[in-house]
């Protein structure tokens, strides 16, 4: 797995995966280690604490949504799929995104992961765009 890092433009990892891949206990040091290997955007998911994203010259932290969790199966995939969809829809490479755009995309991804966790199963729990937007409008952010 480590040998593939230089081939990735965008990586999404959990805090535990980051330490395993980089050997760094510090979240920031681990993310910067990925960037030093050629990753353009490193996103670390932190469960109830939301996520942190790192790109050259940029670090953003976004809280997640305060939903009633039933099953987290598929939440990470939902998060990453939503993030990738937004980046692709923007027509920009990760390094071309403004901090505001990236922040909005991360918020959308957090809403996708949070919404997924309100249902059981993996594929059946994947939220629609409408469900994600409803979460963003109606569910308060979780500040841990």
Protein language model annotation of sequence segments:
Residues 1-32, 49-50:
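Conserved beta-alpha-beta core of the PfkB/ribokinase-like small-molecule kinase fold
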Residues 23-144:
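Conserved phosphate-binding/catalytic region of the ribokinase-like
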